[in-house]
Amino acid sequence: MGEKLICNNKKAYHDYFIEEKMEAGLVLLGTEVKSLRAGKANLNDSFMLVRDGEAFLHNLHISPYEFGNRQNHQADRNRKLLLHRKQIDRLYGRIREQGYSIVPLRMYFKDGLVKVEIGLAKGKKLYDKREDMKKKDSQRELSQALKSKNRE
């Protein structure tokens, strides 16, 4: 089939240097999947923690399903990530290093299953963010100059 994007975490690319990416599955309830099919999810401010040898995604907001009954899910509950033991151990070792964290980058459907792309990230300082903004501005100006030159 392919991939159908549910949501992106643009803030992660702004606040972190992404060093490594990997794909993980999610343990979800039925009403959560229905809400995700409607595109009602928010990855901003979410992060991954390892507890008792298991990986959990915190602060992932999935809006309650509109047509759900009293057994609807909680919007901000912690959700378990499906990763291999070696992957969890390697990520946990990197998290213990100073300045590293794991953030979700995007969520998508892959062959009918919900997947999350997580990234091993190191926080950016304020001057790094300014430097990135300068690079984007100069790149934008360059592309506009080339575009106007091609029109002539």
From Swiss-Prot:
PANTHER family: SSRA-BINDING PROTEIN, TMRNA-BINDING COMPONENT OF TRANS-TRANSLATION TAGGING COMPLEX. The lineage of its organism: Bacteria, Pseudomonadati, Thermodesulfobacteriota, Desulfuromonadia, Desulfuromonadales. This is SsrA-binding protein. It comes from Pelobacter propionicus (strain DSM 2379 / NBRC 103807 / OttBd1). HAMAP family: SmpB. Gene3D superfamilies: 2.40.280.10. Residues 141-152 have a biased composition (Polar residues). Belongs to the SmpB family. One of its GO terms (molecular function) is RNA binding.
